[in-house]
């Protein structure tokens, strides 16, 4: 079983992530993680923090000379702004006189609607929001992207490749007829300000962000993750928590600000008749069954079909709105407006990078659950043996009725 945890606060000294259960022999370097974190900082609508956030990466354990050891991998992502926050976010007690007058230490008693502030204060008994927003911040996703880099490298060794793109930004949306991106498109996607390959749609998305910025608003959108060469049979139909789609949905919903997830055509499928909702089965060129479309997103009954795996995540507008929303000051009881922390207008393109990481972690777990292996080489052998054992369809005889009725299986 692959397990992962992160620790750390937004303005603390560092974020730390640990992933356990991955096999030995995965190629990964500090630079690989650094490059993945640089991709997380991409995207039109990001705030000033992205310009000076450096994400100083240190691999603390589980890797030697660029290969995983099979032991837990620990990665630290240092906060280059830590000296400015050293007293405010110190783990040990700080004398009150050293904190007095520090603007960064001001009590945040006007909770922001849509954030963890108010509910977290009520749940944990805090009298201000700082202890909540530090951990609830999407800065935590840097640690998840770091861990996802290792999982993604493992999948790459097995021929499984991941790509994501932005399909909607505010009211601007990619036409449904637009072809899916492939992994080779990653550099082109990352070079686009909103990570959308269609120039006309990309320009419309940029305009949406500009309009929101001028209006003192924030903006949400939808990202889609596509996974190529996923083998048949990841996940299971037998229990709810073993279903691959449920595991992916939970991982994506666990990303900050994600409010909806769909697999394949998802909600659009609900509006179709049954004959137009499902993927037909045909004889493939290799003699094995194949799907004639990908409406299900490569997952049926909780199991991967071997087709293109597609999942989408809807991100709400960032809750720290420059045009501050109405709230109540919990220290005075006065109705007022929410405090404003430095934030982005939008972070939808970055959400695609985080979603890639979460999908990679879930699929790495599912691959090892299905194929096992203490080393990459062993997992690869098991996968290749399974794929070779998937039977081809029999050659139809001349006397076989092409569309003969089978009768009702449940008379």
Curated annotation (Swiss-Prot):
GO terms for molecular function: chorismate synthase activity; FMN binding. Its cofactor is FMNH2. Its EC number is 4.2.3.5. GO terms for cellular component: cytosol. It catalyses: 5-O-(1-carboxyvinyl)-3-phosphoshikimate = chorismate + phosphate. NADP(+) binds at residues 40, 46. Reduced FMN (FMNH(2)). InterPro entries: Chorismate_synth, Chorismate_synth_AroC_sf, Chorismate_synthase_CS. GO terms for biological process: amino acid biosynthetic process; aromatic amino acid family biosynthetic process; chorismate biosynthetic process. Pathway: Metabolic intermediate biosynthesis; chorismate biosynthesis; chorismate from D-erythrose 4-phosphate and phosphoenolpyruvate: step 7/7. FMN binds at residues 135-137, 256-257, 301, 316-320, 342. Residues 278-299 are annotated as: Disordered. Residues 285-294 have a biased composition (Basic and acidic residues). Keywords: Amino-acid biosynthesis, Aromatic amino acid biosynthesis, FAD, Flavoprotein, FMN, Lyase, NADP. PANTHER family: CHORISMATE SYNTHASE. Belongs to the chorismate synthase family. Homotetramer. This reaction introduces a second double bond into the aromatic ring system. This is Chorismate synthase. It comes from Micrococcus luteus (strain ATCC 4698 / DSM 20030 / JCM 1464 / CCM 169 / CCUG 5858 / IAM 1056 / NBRC 3333 / NCIMB 9278 / NCTC 2665 / VKM Ac-2230). The lineage of its organism: Bacteria, Bacillati, Actinomycetota, Actinomycetes, Micrococcales.
